[in-house]
């Protein structure tokens, strides 16, 4: 396969670079997005062809940036389940609700998609040393795919992040740095280190190919819904890469003639006071003045996303919305979804369900709405949030009424 990647286009100044350019960002410093020979793809493949392919994100390989199939670094990522949650739908007040469960990906998160696409393409271009600032799950995914590809990964994260993030990266062979500071400090330090040591800085939005991996989430939703779109997609948003990727993917599907002009409303879900939420409701074109807050959901707390201008553009182009969710609501919803629907969601994923409830109260969604929310990681990555006063029964004792009552209290 020769691939259909045509080039890279700047999201700010519209500069264009040929497809074999090793650029990560535009000369002006802004985000680049991949562009494809869509006319060629239209002649080469149909939705029927895709349906017969293996259930991974690479079933859409014509819409991915790798030139040669032999360059693909994969562990079977993508084509994650769309799980209907009818009890939750009734209780939050929408007609239909699905959870796109990204926790089934390798390393347990949606980050596998971006890592697979980016490392595959960059290695194809001869780039083999990467700097990956993270809050945990991204670094783990890049470490795992880096190990599989045989490339060098350097990852840094705040010391406040759960241990699983850095320990997973370490066991996969990455160089790991824990930073006693904020996410902003991590990005600054890794940017400086990348320039000093000659690493490619692969943070969210700072290279074009992660968008392409994340784009496949939207392609899958459309295919799994019979080449239709839902009314709204609620997405846990940190750097905005997934929002941007899906928006881009829907435009490509329309140009291919595989869907019409309708679009789902893209909804950014962040912690309360999140940068994109603040900018969206203030009518701003980029994020200014947001502050770091400690949170149980670090994946949706980024003070100044690199691609904020593109994420905000995507929300407004789709008549979208932005919702901030307090930690207490995310944690309560995490436990509620476990007990009602059996889904062990991450706090970031649970925040999207809480956001649906808020949007119903505000009149943004209603009883006829068909809604998809994202669980971006398995809740198993957050065992520290599931502590509870469960009874300890002596081996020679009994599970008596008091123990049963304590167990009931522990489950909430």
Question: Where are each of the predicted segments found?
Answer:
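PLP-dependent amino-acid enzyme catalytic core
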Residues: 1-412
């Amino acid at each position: 396969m020769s691939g259909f990647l045509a080039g890279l286009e700047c999201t700010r100044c519209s500069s264009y670079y040929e497809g074999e350019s090793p650029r990560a960002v535009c000369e002006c410093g802004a985000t680049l997005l991949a562009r494809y020979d869509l006319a060629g793809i239209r002649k080469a493949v149909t939705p029927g062809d895709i349906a017969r392919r293996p259930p991974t994100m690479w079933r859409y390989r014509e819409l991915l940036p790798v030139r040669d199939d032999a360059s693909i670094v994969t562990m079977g990522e993508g084509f994650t389940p769309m799980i209907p949650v009818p009890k939750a739908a009734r209780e939050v007040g929408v007609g239909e609700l699905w959870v796109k469960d990204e926790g089934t990906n390798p390393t347990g998160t949606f980050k596998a998609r971006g890592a697979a696409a980016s490392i595959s393409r960059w290695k194809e271009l001869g780039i083999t040393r990467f700097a990956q600032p993270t809050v945990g799950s991204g670094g783990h995914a890049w470490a795992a795919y880096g190990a599989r590809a045989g490339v060098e990964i350097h990852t840094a994260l705040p010391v406040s992040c759960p241990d699983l993030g850095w320990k997973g990266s370490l066991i996969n062979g990455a160089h790991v740095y824990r930073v006693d500071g904020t996410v902003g400090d991590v990005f600054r330090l890794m940017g400086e280190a990348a320039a000093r040591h000659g690493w490619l800085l692969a943070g969210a939005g700072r290279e074009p190919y992660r968008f392409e991996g994340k784009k496949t989430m939207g392609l899958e939703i459309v295919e799994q819904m019979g080449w239709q779109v839902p009314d709204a997609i609620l997405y846990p948003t940190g750097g905005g890469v997934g929002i941007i990727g899906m928006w881009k993917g829907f435009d490509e599907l329309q140009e291919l003639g595989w869907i019409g002009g309708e679009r789902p409303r893209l909804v950014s879900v962040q912690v309360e006071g999140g940068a994109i939420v603040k900018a969206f409701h203030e009518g701003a074109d980029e994020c200014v003045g947001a502050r770091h807050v400690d949170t149980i959901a670090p994946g949706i707390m980024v003070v100044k996303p690199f691609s904020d201008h593109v994420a905000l553009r995507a929300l407004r182009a789709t008549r979208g919305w932005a919702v901030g969710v307090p930690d207490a609501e995310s944690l309560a919803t995490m436990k509620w979804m476990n007990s009602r629907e059996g889904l062990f969601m991450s706090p970031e994923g649970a925040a999207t369900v809480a956001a649906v409830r808020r949007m119903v109260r505000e009149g943004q969604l209603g009883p006829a709405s068909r809604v998809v929310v994202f669980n971006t990681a398995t809740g198993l990555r957050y065992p520290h949030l599931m502590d509870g006063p469960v009874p300890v029964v002596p081996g020679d004792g009994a599970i008596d009424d008091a123990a049963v009552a304590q167990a009931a209290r522990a489950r909430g």
